[in-house]
Amino acid sequence: MTDNVSAVILAGGASRRMGTDKSMLKLKGKKMIEIVIESISDIFDELVIVSNSPEKFDYKNNDFKVVSDKLTHLKRSSLRGIYTGLTEISNEYGFIFAGDMPFISPELIKAMISEMRKDKWDIIIPVISGHYEPLFAVYHKNCHYTMKQQLLHENFKITDSLKEFKVLELTDNYCVQYDEYLASFFNINTPEDLEQARKYLGKTE
């Protein structure tokens, strides 16, 4: 288990493009959210799920906490989910994950946490092919104070948050050392993505 870092999974609810809650889609007979949990449960001693529909996660004997989005009078956004998760963790850092990432690399997670321990970073975030990956990133818990002010000003861009913090950007070349095909950053946005994931696993439902 990793001391001082909690896992936060954002399971935001219905997707416009998928027409359903992506975290509830199935691969190999398991819900997407279950695959994510299994991928990371041996690494973290605290797991928080942020959801607009917490009743979907009312599992018996679970080892995680489910919380509802805060600031619900504001536009739904990933930044709002990150903010909510960081306010709920008991550890100093939160590793944020999307609930629709079925190919997470534990080795890359551990490497990123190791980088966090080398210096007092506020955020450690991969930049893959020039694009930030804020839903596979490490955040200091105290980032939520600045994020709240940004949300209250109705600015929902996560990249704008980065300007306010001490940020370590991890390049493609860094990440491929621990995740050869960068599969950790594959998420399910469309039915075509779901079919691609099923083919990757070599089995359809």
UniProtKB/Swiss-Prot annotation:
Entry annotated with the keyword Cytoplasm: yes
Location in the cell: Cytoplasm
GO MF annotation, one: GTP binding
Keywords from the named record: Cytoplasm, GTP-binding, Magnesium, Metal-binding, Molybdenum cofactor biosynthesis, Nucleotide-binding, Transferase
Disulfide bonds: none
InterPro entries hit by this protein: MobA-like_NTP_Trfase, Molybde_CF_guanTrfase, Nucleotide-diphossugar_trans
Coiled-coil zones: none
Residues the entry annotates as binding GTP: 10-12, 22, 69, 100
Residue sites binding Mg(2+) per the record: 100
Gene Ontology CC: cytoplasm
One example of a Gene Ontology biological process annotation: Mo-molybdopterin cofactor biosynthetic process
Cofactor(s) it depends on: Mg(2+)
Enzyme nomenclature, EC number: 2.7.7.77
Predominant location: cytoplasm
Catalytic activity: Mo-molybdopterin + GTP + H(+) = Mo-molybdopterin guanine dinucleotide + diphosphate
Job of this protein: Transfers a GMP moiety from GTP to Mo-molybdopterin (Mo-MPT) cofactor (Moco or molybdenum cofactor) to form Mo-molybdopterin guanine dinucleotide (Mo-MGD) cofactor.
Domain notes: The N-terminal domain determines nucleotide recognition and specific binding, while the C-terminal domain determines the specific binding to the target protein.
Recorded family membership: Belongs to the MobA family.
PANTHER family according to UniProt: MOLYBDENUM COFACTOR GUANYLYLTRANSFERASE
Name of the protein in question: Probable molybdenum cofactor guanylyltransferase
Species name: Natranaerobius thermophilus (strain ATCC BAA-1301 / DSM 18059 / JW/NM-WN-LF)
